């Protein structure tokens, strides 16, 4: 029988001092034999997706202790990408993922915890904790804070009734809106606690946690404000004790993160991502999580899946007026997984923390096939329509569910939005190791696009050039030296893409970068160009006026410059060093320098190489 890890610090004469300290935390003799469950929280008042998590850790802890475990809570950091956006704060976002993973490892291993419940929500917190779970490989269950309700608005010139923070950004840069209208949009864009309401990075990752098998059904789509979400937290507390005892005392196999999140589970997660048009950031994170679990899942696998998995669901920012609350009404993630399964595009035999197999879970939770009142009730959980920062503050329910798979929010393969999926990997001489585009957000008219390079040596330059009218129709805005090393930190480019839309160039220009994009990005926005400029990538050799050819259907991107000219440019660049031609006013701290020194390319998930 595997010995509880916690016995290292709770048993033996030599641990008298440690037990004395444990007693000072409230433990008694009867606790020194129970599994110690780490409650890994991420509460912060800086982030709306985490502002409501303060008391939820202790709520889970009470369930853990009632089920026979000992609960010990600690907190990680959490960066709000939306607040950090558009200034040097964004340099810290991606590196914070590694800090989160490390901090979880440090706390869990230093105190010999046996298992953990991870309470995450926003962009880098869920992937950071998933990386830690794969690294530690102890029983773990993920339960996120949930999505916020969509903003509701009625402005004549705005072609939508549901909005989010991206709409506020676009409106603010669009001169057709008055200051009063912009303020009205701003005030209504983010009405409640929770992760931003569209299929941005946070919600994408929380949905993928379901597909990986490490989160409970409803984790990705049940609103933060709805009382039904409370049940997920309570169930996580009870179930973690159950699977911990089954692993350590019953010697049962298939309960650890690496046994659940196998190569096939990563294929399931990526297939879901492609089917729902998730954030391109998920590519980075899935690669990093797989790396931590020693799962050989690569960009090549993603490319293979992207060629056969259809787009079954379009959510903001890929379409207007459809948000996570609408996905939930249509049956949530298990309804998308069910459609993938029926299309032969899912590994049904993968395990989960809640069911013996993914197929068994689909049979119970997919509203199209399940005769399950519990599932029907869960997916009728509706928004409350009241501004609040309180979790579980309302119990509204839809009168009916969206089960229309021909024209509804979730489609069957036969009625897919496109038979080509929502994410694609492109390769070419400007991106030998690949780059990523969210095809679900690209208008069909520009899936094939040839344009003229407009080179910017930083995101700041790009923003200035777009807002001052220097970027013209037909341009490919190239933003370089913003990769993991070059930034450092691989900034998100939400402002440039939003400003292109506000200037009416969303369908007339492309954007190409070795940086990355917010989950709120749409349009012909191609990121993660690898190798990055700072590593000697060809993107560093592009000059103003060069022709760039983008062919998404054929997964190709090409810089139309001869090999001889590129060789001459490379020799000249190597002579002066791979750095921006125009000096940047950017203070790089010691922490960021350390990150830049160790990080790898986006094609490898921007993980550290040590």
UniProtKB/Swiss-Prot annotation:
Q: Which residues form the active site?
A: 518
User: According to its UniProt record, which reaction does this protein catalyse?
Assistant: (2R)-2,3-dihydroxy-3-methylbutanoate = 3-methyl-2-oxobutanoate + H2O; (2R,3R)-2,3-dihydroxy-3-methylpentanoate = (S)-3-methyl-2-oxopentanoate + H2O
Indicate whether Transcription appears among the record's keywords: no
The UniProt record lists the EC number as 4.2.1.9
Modification N6-carboxylysine, positions: 124
In the UniProt record, does the keyword Cell wall biogenesis/degradation occur? no
Q: Which cofactors?
A: [2Fe-2S] cluster; Mg(2+)
Q: Could you name the domain of life of the organism this protein comes from? A: Bacteria
The pathway is: Amino-acid biosynthesis; L-isoleucine biosynthesis; L-isoleucine from 2-oxobutanoate: step 3/4; Amino-acid biosynthesis; L-valine biosynthesis; L-valine from pyruvate: step 3/4
The record, for Gene3D superfamilies, names: IlvD/EDD C-terminal domain-like (3.50.30.80)
Which molecular-function annotation in GO is an example for this chain?
dihydroxy-acid dehydratase activity
Q: Which GO terms describe its biological process?
A: isoleucine biosynthetic process; L-valine biosynthetic process
Report the cofactor remark: Binds 1 [2Fe-2S] cluster per subunit. This cluster acts as a Lewis acid cofactor.
Q: State the InterPro entries in the record.
A: Dihydro-acid_dehy_C, DihydroxyA_deHydtase, DiOHA_6PGluconate_deHydtase_CS, ILV_EDD_C, ILV_EDD_N, IlvD/EDD_N
Quaternary structure annotation from Swiss-Prot or TrEMBL: Homodimer.
Q: Main role?
A: Functions in the biosynthesis of branched-chain amino acids. Catalyzes the dehydration of (2R,3R)-2,3-dihydroxy-3-methylpentanoate (2,3-dihydroxy-3-methylvalerate) into 2-oxo-3-methylpentanoate (2-oxo-3-methylvalerate) and of (2R)-2,3-dihydroxy-3-methylbutanoate (2,3-dihydroxyisovalerate) into 2-oxo-3-methylbutanoate (2-oxoisovalerate), the penultimate precursor to L-isoleucine and L-valine, respectively.
Family the entry assigns: Belongs to the IlvD/Edd family.
The protein depicted here goes by the name Dihydroxy-acid dehydratase
């Amino acid at each position: 029988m595997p010995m509880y890890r916690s016995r290292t610090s709770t048993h033996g004469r030599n641990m008298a001092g440690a037990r004395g300290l444990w007693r000072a935390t409230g433990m008694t003799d009867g606790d020194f034999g129970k599994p110690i469950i780490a409650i890994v929280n991420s509460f912060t008042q800086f982030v709306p997706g985490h502002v409501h998590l303060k008391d939820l850790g202790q709520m889970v802890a009470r369930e853990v202790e009632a089920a026979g475990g000992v609960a010990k809570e600690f907190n990680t950091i959490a960066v709000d990408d939306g607040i950090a956006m558009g200034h040097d704060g964004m340099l810290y976002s991606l590196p914070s993922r590694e800090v989160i993973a490390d901090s979880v490892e440090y706390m869990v291993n230093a105190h010999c915890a046996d298992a953990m419940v991870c309470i995450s929500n926003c962009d880098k917190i869920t992937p950071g904790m998933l990386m830690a779970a794969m690294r530690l490989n102890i029983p773990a269950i993920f339960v996120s804070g949930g999505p916020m309700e969509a903003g509701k608005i009625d402005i004549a010139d705005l072609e939508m009734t549901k909005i989010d923070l991206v709409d506020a950004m676009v409106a603010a840069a669009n001169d057709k809106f008055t200051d009063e209208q912009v303020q009205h949009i701003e005030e209504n864009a983010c009405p409640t606690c929770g992760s931003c309401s569209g299929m941005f990075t946070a919600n994408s990752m929380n949905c993928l946690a379901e597909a990986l098998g490490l989160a409970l059904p409803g984790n990705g789509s049940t609103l933060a404000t709805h009382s039904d979400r409370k049940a997920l937290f309570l169930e996580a507390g009870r179930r973690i004790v159950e699977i911990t005892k089954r692993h350590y005392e019953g010697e049962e196999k298939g309960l650890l993160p690496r046994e659940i999140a196998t190569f096939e589970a990563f294929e399931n997660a990526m297939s879901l991502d492609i089917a729902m048009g998730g954030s391109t950031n998920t590519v980075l994170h899935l690669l990093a999580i797989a790396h931590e679990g020693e799962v050989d899942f690569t960009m090549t696998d993603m490319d293979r899946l992207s060629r056969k998995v259809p787009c079954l669901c379009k959510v903001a920012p890929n379409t207007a007026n459809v948000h996570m609350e609408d996905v939930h009404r249509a049956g949530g993630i298990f309804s998308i997984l069910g459609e993938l399964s029926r299309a032969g595009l899912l590994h049904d035999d993968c395990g989960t923390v809640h069911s013996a197999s993914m197929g068994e879970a689909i049979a119970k939770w997919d509203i199209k096939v399940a005769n399950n009142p519990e599932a029907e009730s869960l997916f009728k959980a509706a928004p409350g329509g009241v501004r609040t920062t309180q979790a579980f503050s309302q119990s509204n329910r839809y009168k009916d569910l969206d089960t229309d798979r021909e024209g509804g929010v979730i489609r069957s393969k036969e009625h897919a939005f496109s038979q080509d999926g929502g994410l694609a990997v492109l390769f070419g001489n400007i991106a030998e190791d690949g780059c990523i585009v969210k095809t679900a957000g690209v208008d069909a008219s520009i899936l094939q696009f040839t344009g003229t390079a407009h080179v910017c040596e930083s995101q700041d330059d790009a923003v200035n050039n777009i807002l001052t009218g220097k970027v013209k129709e037909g341009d490919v805005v190239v933003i370089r030296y913003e990769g993991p090393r070059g930034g450092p930190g691989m900034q998100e480019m939400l402002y440039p893409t939003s400003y292109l839309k506000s200037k009416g160039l969303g369908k007339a220009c492309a954007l190409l970068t070795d940086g990355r994009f917010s989950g709120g990005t749409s349009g012909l926005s191609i990121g993660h160009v690898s190798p990055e400029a700072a590593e000697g990538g060809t993107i560093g050799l592009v000059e103003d006026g060069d022709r760039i050819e983008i062919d998404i259907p054929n997964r190709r991107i090409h810089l139309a410059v001869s090999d001889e000219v590129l060789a001459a440019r490379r020799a000249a660049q190597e002579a002066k060093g791979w750095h921006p031609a125009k000096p940047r006013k950017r203070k790089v701290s010691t922490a960021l320098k350390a990150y830049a020194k160790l990080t790898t390319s986006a094609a490898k998930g921007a993980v550290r190489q040590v």
